[in-house]
Design a protein with these regions (language model features):
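ADP-ribose/NAD+-binding catalytic cleft of ART/PARP-like enzymes
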Residues: 1-52
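Conserved NAD+-utilizing ADP-ribose enzyme module
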Residues: 10, 19-24, 51-53, 63-172
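Compact, well-ordered interaction domains used in eukaryotic information-processing assemblies
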Residues: 44-48, 57, 66
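Conserved catalytic/binding loops enriched for acidic/polar residues
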Residues: 60
Length: 172
């Protein structure tokens, strides 16, 4: 399955040195919304030993299949609020059974509900958690437990110039 993921520049060195990157930190977001993170992590059929939380990426953006272009990068950064100078774009090919797909907006709704931000339901248990897996349309996020060197098809840096992103392929 083709996936795009934005990862901190340090991840590239970890992949070069170790051959694999695992999400085994207790991130701020996982601490704030552990039920949502555990739900998507547990939905991954085949997990890398040692991984403790999902890595996030994209399967579909702007309601179309992925291509590495300025429009796709702009939309992904709008949704994730990443610091563009600190991240690289990884184009991955991962076996389907190692990936779980979710509707980005339904996942965000679930996180907001769990965190108590503008709650619609009286408690998180009332939130229809299965809606995060409704992926017929929209922005589709992908979660997986590791990035292995062999998953990487391309790595790109990007820089915003005049409201467009200049994309540079990095030799890996």
């Amino acid at each position: 399955m083709k996936i795009l993921t934005f990862q901190h520049k340090d991840i590239l060195n970890e992949l070069k040195n170790k051959g694999v990157y695992l999400a085994n930190i207790n991130s701020f977001y996982k601490q704030q919304t552990p039920k949502c993170y555990n739900t998507v992590f547990n939905s991954i059929k085949v997990k890398e030993p040692g991984a403790t939380q999902p890595i996030f990426g994209w399967k579909k953006v702007l309601n179309k299949e992925l291509i590495v272009d300025s429009e796709t990068i702009k939309r992904c950064l709008e949704m994730t609020y990443l610091e563009e100078d600190e991240y690289l774009l990884f184009e991955l090919n991962i076996d389907d059974d190692k990936v779980s797909l979710q509707n980005f907006y339904n996942f965000v709704d679930a996180r907001c509900e769990e965190e108590g931000i503008d709650p619609y339901y009286e408690n998180f248990e009332e939130f229809p958690i299965d809606t995060i897996f409704e992926i017929e349309d929209g922005e589709i996020q992908a979660t997986f437990s590791s990035i292995r060197k062999e998953y990487i098809e391309n790595v790109y840096s990007y820089k915003k110039i005049n409201n467009e992103y200049e994309i540079t392929k990095i030799n890996f």
